Amino acid sequence: MQKIKVLCVDDSALIRSLMTEIINSQPDMTVVATAPDPLVARELIKQHNPDVLTLDVEMPRMDGLDFLEKLMRLRPMPVVMVSSLTERGSEITLRALELGAVDFVTKPRVGIRDGMLDYAEKLADKIRAASRARVRQAPQPQAAARSADSAAAAPMINNPLVSTEKLIIIGASTGGTEAIREVLTPLPPDAPAVLIAQHMPPGFTKSFAQRLNGLCRIAVKEAEHGERVLPGHAYIAPGHAHLLLARSGANYIAQLSDEPPVNRHRPSVDVLFRSAATHAGKNAIGVILTGMGRDGAAGLLEMKRAGAHTFAQDEASCIVFGMPREAIALGGADEVAPLADMSRRVMARLATMGDRVQRV
């Protein structure tokens, strides 16, 4: 079996050494070269033709974002960003995902062995997924402007969807930040409440919510424990907790849980979907988007069995066709839709629900 060829780009010799040690310990991948900055990396890419690039966010001579933008325009390839757990680091990482990076990992903590096995497993999984990922070219400025214009001009649904009884429940992983943006930006201000579980570490989900809030016509925020779930709002699971839907009388509320990871994830899509199956039933729409693994597949099936209408993103538009594929294989998806049409299909389905609000 041919090994996945990886090029590691980081200005820290210690980080380059640690990443090399982790990657070379895997049976199916190898580091073909390392580079201290993007200018050296540019020549090594020509020489080694790597399958995956790991790229530090902030470096001398040329920062990671500038290099990524040029790379995705001139020679698109799978890139996994390596980021620090800081507010600035999370904002830059989200911008990198917009520019076409497949995924990101936090920097390994040099000299601290606790948690290193878990980190190594996550890094290897992300590199494997990236090697199979569908790579997007960097968006042109005109395309971004058209996207914003189309979101502003998205048609309103004739029947205002203001009932808290209707909910959109979304789960995603690898490639999900951009997929979620594409689903949320066309939603009208009176759309039903949206609850989202996106696999992200602590510290990144708040920046993700803030970025979406500036792009969407609905309000987007990081979910808080016990808050009421309202129409026209989207609630993103914090990176350290499971997000669950619950009821308080006639109202829906968000609950956060620090229970152990499910499917190796916290937040877990399955946890969110199962809570929606229990407390929303026929009043919910379930959507599973791009991502590796199977988290959310069983939960989407539970939502469907509880009466919810369910969607899975199609293979052609997924960065990684893992979670949707598993959901489809289990029979959990009522419809399979391309990402570009997902928001319209969801809103059209909600419009057909009319006043058929079911109490559960």
From Swiss-Prot:
What's a single GO MF annotation on this record? protein-glutamate methylesterase activity
- Tell me which family the UniProt entry assigns to this protein: Belongs to the CheB family.
Q: Which InterPro entries match?
A: CheB-like, CheB_C, CheY-like_superfamily, Sig_transdc_resp-reg_Me-estase, Sig_transdc_resp-reg_receiver
Q: Could you tell me which residue ranges the Response regulatory domain spans? A: 5-122
Give the originating organism.
Answer: Burkholderia orbicola (strain AU 1054)
Q: Which GO terms describe its cellular component?
A: cytoplasm
Q: What is its EC number?
A: 3.1.1.61, 3.5.1.44
Gene name of this polypeptide: cheB1
GO BP annotations of the record are: chemotaxis
Per UniProt, which keywords does this protein have? Chemotaxis, Cytoplasm, Hydrolase, Phosphoprotein
Free-text note on domains in this protein's UniProt record = Contains a C-terminal catalytic domain, and an N-terminal region which modulates catalytic activity.
Positions modified as 4-aspartylphosphate? 56
Provide the active-site residues from the annotation.
173, 199, 295
Q: Does the keyword Ligase apply?
A: no
Q: Which PROSITE patterns match?
A: CHEB, RESPONSE_REGULATORY
Q: What class of enzyme is it?
A: hydrolase
Q: Is Disulfide bond one of the keywords?
A: no
What lineage does the source organism belong to?
A: Bacteria, Pseudomonadati, Pseudomonadota, Betaproteobacteria, Burkholderiales
Q: How is it modified after translation?
A: Phosphorylated by CheA. Phosphorylation of the N-terminal regulatory domain activates the methylesterase activity.
- Stated role: Involved in chemotaxis. Part of a chemotaxis signal transduction system that modulates chemotaxis in response to various stimuli. Catalyzes the demethylation of specific methylglutamate residues introduced into the chemoreceptors (methyl-accepting chemotaxis proteins or MCP) by CheR. Also mediates the irreversible deamidation of specific glutamine residues to glutamic acid.
Q: This chain belongs to which protein, by name?
A: Protein-glutamate methylesterase/protein-glutamine glutaminase 1
Q: Where in the cell is it found?
A: Cytoplasm
User: Which segments constitute the CheB-type methylesterase domain?
Assistant: 161-353
Please, which domain of life does this record's source organism belong to?
Bacteria
Primary location: cytoplasm
The record's section on Gene3D superfamilies has: 3.40.50.2300, Methylesterase CheB, C-terminal domain
The family database entries (NCBIfam families) matched by this protein are listed as: PRK00742.1, PRK12555.1
From the UniProt record, list the reaction(s) this protein catalyses. [protein]-L-glutamate 5-O-methyl ester + H2O = L-glutamyl-[protein] + methanol + H(+); L-glutaminyl-[protein] + H2O = L-glutamyl-[protein] + NH4(+)
